[in-house]
């Protein structure tokens, strides 16, 4: 299963924020510079992460963005569920004439559930804590 770029960059943004010293704010511009993604795309991602409670956005001169909850409380599977459209195939009868008898959708649904269940075993903290190579690449040592 390949994640959309929206989910990919959402996870990367969270990884970046989790790599910063606790409580330190960053900016959308800083995140876009680190990953080379368009600002408009990142704004949409951060807005959705903020609505879901994963990111806190503070407006104003001293504002910015930071994690909305501890990295240890953010399950990767939950983030993917929030950001990723998880429908792998279009099974409407208008697009596929075998829909009434097809078992593929059920098989794919079970596969997606297994994928998400595995991701639920990891928190954001698991991905970033004591990961010196990551800090070095993100320039947040």
From Swiss-Prot:
Q: Which cysteines are cross-linked by disulfides?
A: none
Q: Name one cellular component (GO) term.
A: cytosol
Q: Does the keyword Electron transport apply?
A: no
Keywords (A to Z) from UniProt:
2Fe-2S, DNA-binding, Iron, Iron-sulfur, Metal-binding, Repressor, Transcription, Transcription regulation
Q: Name one GO molecular function term.
A: iron ion binding
InterPro entries in the record: TR_Rrf2-type_CS, Tscrpt_reg_Rrf2, Tscrpt_rep_HTH_NsrR, WH-like_DNA-bd_sf, WH_DNA-bd_sf
**DNA-binding region as annotated in the record:** 28-51
The GO biological-process annotations, alphabetized, read as: negative regulation of DNA-templated transcription
Output the superkingdom of the source species. Answer: Bacteria
Fetch the Pfam families from UniProt: Rrf2 (PF02082)
Residues in HTH rrf2-type domain copies: 2-129
Note on how the cofactor is bound: Binds 1 [2Fe-2S] cluster per subunit.
- Look up the record and name the cofactor or cofactors this protein needs: [2Fe-2S] cluster
Provide the binding site for [2Fe-2S] cluster.
91, 96, 102
> What is the annotated role of this protein in its UniProt record?
Nitric oxide-sensitive repressor of genes involved in protecting the cell against nitrosative stress. May require iron for activity.
Q: What is the protein named?
A: HTH-type transcriptional repressor NsrR
State the organism of origin: Escherichia coli O157:H7 (strain EC4115 / EHEC)
